[in-house]
Amino acid sequence: MTNEQLQRKHQSLATLITRIIFLVLGLITIGIFIQSYYFSNKIIKQEVMLTKQQTSALVKSLFNNHLSILQIHHDSNSKNEAIRRFFLDGDDEKLEYYFLSMDQADPTHTPEFRFLTTGEGLLWDDGNAHFYGVNEVLLEKISQSVLFGNNWHFMSLHTLMGLRNMLVRRSPVIDTTTGEVLGQYYISVVLDNNFPLVEMLESGSNSDNIVMLVGDKVISHSLSGNEPYDLDSLLAMRDEPSAFDDCLISQTPIEINSTDTLVSILAIQENSHVASLQRQHYLGLATSVVLMLMLSLAIRSWIQNRVANALESLMAYSRFAGTGEKYERFNGSDILEFAHIGHTLENTFEQLESQRRSFQDLFNFALSPMMVWSESGLLIQMNPAAMKELGIEHASPQDFSNPLFQLFKLKLSPHLKMAAQGATLTGINVPIGEKIFRWNLSPIVVENGISGIIVQGQDITTLIDAEKQSNLARREAEQSAKTRADFLAKMSHEIRTPLNGILGIAQLLKRSVNDAENLKQVDVLCNSGEHLLAVLNDILDFSKIEQGKFNIKKRDFNFYDTLNTLENIYRPICREKGVSFEIHNQIPLDCQLHTDQVRLNQIMFNLISNAVKFTPAGRIEVSFKLEKFARSEHSILSIQVSDTGIGIDESKLESIFEPFVQADSLSTREYGGSGLGLTIVKNLVEMLEGEISVQSELCKGSTFYLSIPVEKGECEEQKTPTNPKPEQLFGQGLKVLLVEDNHTNAFILKAFCQKYQMSVEWVQDGTQALEKLKEHAFDLILMDNQLPKMGGIEATREIRETLKLGTPIYACTADAQESTKQEFLSAGANRVIVKPIKEQELHDELLHFKAHYWVEH
């Protein structure tokens, strides 16, 4: 096709650009015209609306100011001696003289009429009400309508002269000596034909006229009749306002006591300045259109001459480059874009060649194996790293037939088929010999078709070996943790079983020994057992914390219960030791808190027990305070535990919360302890999302500060708990089945139960228990865990599932693990008691049994 044919078929780029620019400028001009017209109209309307709003606000302010001044005069008058004296001695001459002087002093702010009332009815009126058709009967009606408050009241009243719209307000007249309300002082502002009020609003708002409406009815106006409009036309323009009307109408609704009323005020102003502004706007738009048209023609001529020459030079260079002749440089152009296009064409082939060489170098020198496969699964190319891993020295057919390559190809083929369908695969593990490689397969998409597949590999043999070692170490750690947990559970059971006997016998001896020296020895036995139990519990708790098995269960509880528990436990202990124990509580006793009560009690027991242990003399103080912070959903329970004990050396404060750490070895020998108490406290506080800190001075004492977030619940009336004597707890003797293989534990439990007038039958294993239950009915079953023949958990399940008995079962086990407790409860037990069982603990459980399960026969 010749150049002439091309020119006839296609337009010149210069001509096309010129036409496009001319078209764009035309569209821009039209757009600017439309936008200018739109925004100018909008600005005019906004200006009109702003003027209306300002006028409306000014009218409302003037009206409210008028009422405010009347209200001030009204309240001031009600306190005047002349009015009070009138109620006392009836001197109406002085009263009328007083009101006359007030009206003369400020005639602008004078009500239309006034009247006074007492509880018996109308007492006095100024006589002005009759001018508005309001007689004494209507005055009584007004006073009955305005019975409460001292605010303005709007009312429409049918009078002798027709319907009157008015504002009424009352103010009490009080005897300053006795404080007695003598009566009520009423004032009224009649809105109908209130020309002084209308003139005041007209002059104050700089309006031409004012019209006052009630609904759509005109009740007062300032029109003289010489205006180019009448009331009907004003109301019509009010309903269909326009920014370009001859007059501007602002309607102001009147609110009384922040309540909408039917009263509204129309302010009419001249609108000639808006019409003038509109004419100037149209003239400016016409001028802009003419200027834009002239500018467009000038730009069209300049572009057509300027662009055509530069474009022809670029076209000549592109035609020369397209012939494939010798490479030459572009001569350049004055137009930046054309120069850029020319230089881009100049560098295209050089860049393509450079890219080809760079890609080949990247492929050949990469340390990771790389391959290119066809979509049909044939190897096209591989880099030296891949040849090395596959044992290929030369890309010959003999090398590709070696078993290592064939096995690799066989394992890679399924993934190549997926990639050939367009899927991008990552993280595919395919080994080469003894090494494991992770491969990424990516299809090469050209013109919506797949021309090949790039395969890249990475040696992850070391990573796989490390992962295997990590899994092995994890399994060994889990087995070690399980072994330790099983060991602690076994030791807990083995220690708690004889400890139950020691503490049980000690408690029985305490009630039967009368000799002071023997009682002292029994106390030593009790204290030693309690100490051993505390150490055991600390070790188990610490083990649970390490394993992450300590659960937080938040619920609502009465804070008084915690205070009562601390008071009952530690005051006798401190009294016996000769140490003062004080609780300073700033929280209401009936306050409900939402947190984990069990863990909170455990924290307090550990801290106060430490204070008792390390305070040989002096005092221990515990304080509680509940703080609420702004913008926080939680309150902060602040706790402070102080003692005057041996204190802690400053160098030991940083490590005092670490496990198995005490202030010094001398303290450990003298006071004992496991060194886990404060560690458990710190972990529990952190689990409750709180903070703990300590201040201490050696030989002077220590203070622990705790801050725990809690939610404050509803307060409820505190009920004083009753604690009946054992023999009075049940009205008749209970029949109890005791399942226990240990003779000592059975002896102790039977002795405890006999205090409650219980009839106890003892069996030594689960099988015997089932036989007994088939023959006799019992009120309560006390079930041990580890029993010969049939264990306690299995026996409990048989009682529930086979015998179908609902008899309450209280499990008594020396295994303190949470898993054992859950197994018992899942089998059907009602409660789980952990040995050693103390007398008070058994009493509490029997109280629970009576409250939830006991039915008197």
Swiss-Prot record:
Sequence ranges assigned to domain Response regulatory in this UniProt record: 735-850
InterPro entries the record matches: AI-2_sensor_kinase/phosphatase, CheY-like_superfamily, HATPase_C_sf, His_kinase_dom, HisK_dim/P_dom, HisK_dim/P_sf, LuxQ-periplasm_dom, LuxQ-periplasm_N
Enzyme Commission no: 2.7.13.3, 3.1.3.-
Catalytic activity: ATP + protein L-histidine = ADP + protein N-phospho-L-histidine
Positions carrying 4-aspartylphosphate: D784
Protein's UniProt keywords contain Transmembrane: yes
Protein name, entry field: Autoinducer 2 sensor kinase/phosphatase LuxQ
Record organism: Vibrio vulnificus (strain CMCP6)
